[in-house]
């Protein structure tokens, strides 16, 4: 079930301007709380040099995967199950961490 967030559409361009600069030399980014999946897909389209690792609670995975499937981007990865207060963080090394609207 693909979810939609108007907040993602409203803030994606200002956020993109910042992360384009801050993640210019990065390759692997962990998004904490990917929510609907809109930001992941939008940033993946505009920043193809990044491997964007989505993550969220299992209840949001279907929406994240629906946005990923529609976009067909190989650099936006399937969501990890991540509950920041109770689960272990991924062992993979990331060059940056992103979170918005969570």
Q: Where do the model's predicted regions map?
A:
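Short alpha-helical
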Residues: 10, 38, 59
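Conserved class I S-adenosyl-L-methionine
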Residues: 26-35
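Class I SAM-dependent methyltransferase SAM/SAH-binding core
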Residues: 30, 41-87
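A short beta-strand submotif of the Rossmann-like class I SAM-dependent methyltransferase core
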Residues: 99-102
């Amino acid at each position: 079930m693909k979810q939609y967030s108007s907040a993602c559409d409203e803030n994606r361009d200002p956020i993109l301007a910042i992360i384009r600069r801050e993640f210019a030399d990065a390759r692997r980014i962990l998004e904490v709380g990917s929510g609907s999946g809109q930001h992941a897909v939008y940033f993946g389209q505009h920043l193809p040099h990044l491997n964007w690792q989505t993550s969220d609670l299992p209840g949001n995975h279907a929406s994240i995967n629906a946005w990923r499937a529609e976009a067909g981007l190989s650099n936006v990865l399937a969501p990890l199950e991540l509950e920041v207060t109770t689960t272990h963080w991924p062992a993979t090394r990331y060059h940056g961490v992103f979170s918005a609207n969570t």
